[in-house]
From Swiss-Prot:
This is Polyamine aminopropyltransferase. Belongs to the spermidine/spermine synthase family. InterPro entries: PABS, PABS_CS, SAM-dependent_MTases_sf, Spermi_synthase, Spermidine_synt_N, Spermidine_synt_N_sf. The active site is at residue 158. Transmembrane segments: none annotated. Homodimer or homotetramer. The gene is speE. Its EC number is 2.5.1.16.
Length: 283
């Protein structure tokens, strides 16, 4: 079956993912990237950046919850959180569900992502006015370089793929700066693409770079994300000075807020490592 121009299609490494469109709502070229917004038949509103699906109404909750709750429940007392990227503000919303968080700073280089999210994905921006939230539109790499040593408990890197503006967020030099900015027991989590498509090209080099930078331990979280290439995604957690563990498992069992995907059992399951993946990462 061939698809006509009523479909949006993302082509990635000899695979394709398509959604039938109702209409294109917006398109613009910012100084950093091309952003498109569509209304689809089955997945609600869709945001596309440089031809790649960033989020849809239907499944963004999985990604945002897995980028925030596992790492926060793996830290003993996550008061100060930095989000790099995350311009759609969904991860920020999830972070601010945690009463322990006293400060959540989001640094995204492209303000237009946030302004378009406010218009087309307003439910993701519910917490933008929370007094604990601070939204900055700047270079996240430089922000980390300038951060006071030991000032952060958790760094969440909610970036696009490792090309263009996000490429430097996957470098050993950047990870060294993250270690400096993190306090004792400090944790980093970063979206790390698909195990089926990117283990050799992205995930293994990322884990190697994190350890080369000085992180003591790394751990991959696995979760479904059907609108992303292969439908199977990961987030990589790293701790600067101790093993990555589910430190506050009891609190996660009795979390004081609503989620749609995440719970303590999901976190326990997400760290299970498929055999092919384990062999490639750890030999």
């Amino acid at each position: 079956m061939s698809l006509d121009n009523t479909w949006f299609t993302e082509i990635h490494q000899d695979t394709a993912f398509s959604l039938r469109m109702k209409e294109k709502l917006h398109e613009e070229q910012t100084p950093f990237q091309k952003i498109e917004i569509y209304e689809t038949e089955g997945f609600g509103t869709l945001m596309v950046i440089d031809g790649c699906v960033m989020l849809t109404d239907r499944d963004n909750f999985i990604y945002h919850e897995m980028m925030s709750h596992p790492v926060l429940y793996s830290h003993s007392d996550p008061k100060n959180v930095l989000i790099i990227g995350g311009g759609d503000c969904g991860t920020l919303r999830e972070v601010l569900k945690h009463p322990e968080v006293k400060s959540a700073t989001q640094v995204d280089i492209d303000e237009r992502v946030t302004r378009l999210a406010e218009k087309y994905f307003p439910e993701l921006c519910d917490s933008n006015d929370d007094p604990r939230a601070k939204l900055l539109f700047d270079d996240g790499i430089k922000y980390v370089q300038d951060a006071a040593p030991g000032s952060l408990d958790v760094i969440i890197i909610d970036s696009t793929d490792p090309v263009g503006p996000a490429e430097g967020l996957f470098s050993t030099a950047f990870y060294r700066d993250c270690i400096k900015a993190l306090g004792p027991g400090g944790l980093l989590v970063q979206q790390s693409e698909s195990p089926l498509l990117h283990t050799d090209s992205i995930i293994k080099p990322m884990h190697d770079s994190l350890r080369a930078a000085g992180f003591l331990d790394t751990l991959a979280l696995h979760f479904p994300q059907c609108s992303y290439p292969s439908g199977w995604w990961t987030a990589t957690m790293a701790c600067k000075d101790m093993p990555v563990t589910f430190l506050r498992e009891a609190q996660a069992e009795d979390k004081p807020f609503e989620t749609h995907y995440y719970n303590a059992a999901i976190q326990r399951a997400a760290i299970a490592c498929p055999e092919f993946f384990r062999k490639k990462l750890y030999g």
